[in-house]
From Swiss-Prot:
Family membership noted in the UniProt record: Belongs to the universal ribosomal protein uS14 family.
Assembly: Part of the 30S ribosomal subunit.
Name of the molecule in the record: Small ribosomal subunit protein uS14c
Subcellular location: Plastid, Chloroplast
GO cellular component, one term: chloroplast
Length: 100
């Protein structure tokens, strides 16, 4: 189980990303379409003034049960350990153990 502070920190980052997503997208579009160097530079400075944690690059996928950051399965939102346990207990519909 991950530390609660790390899980909360990741939730806080997700809120910031959602809050500033529209503004960040608009600024990036303006930077792409601007012609003059001065205007582009001014827009770039404005983009840099946004909070650092509002960038989607700083997000890290975590297991929704344990908060584990590694071995994350995007389709389920779970780490490999929890996925295996839940699959064995038939808690994930449509997931079967493979055999050939």
């Amino acid at each position: 189980m991950a530390k609660k502070s790390m899980i909360e920190r990741e939730k806080k980052r997700q809120k910031l990303v959602n809050k500033y997503a529209v503004k960040r997208k608009e600024l990036k579009e303006q930077i792409k379409t601007s012609v003059s160097f001065e205007e582009r530079f001014k827009l770039q400075l404005e983009l840099q003034k946004l909070p650092r944690n509002s960038s989607p690059t700083r997000l890290h996928n975590r297991c929704s049960v344990t908060g584990r950051p590694k071995g994350y399965y995007r389709d389920f939102g779970l780490s490999r350990h929890v996925l295996r346990e839940m699959a064995h207990e038939c808690l994930l519909p449509g997931v079967t153990k493979s055999s050939w």
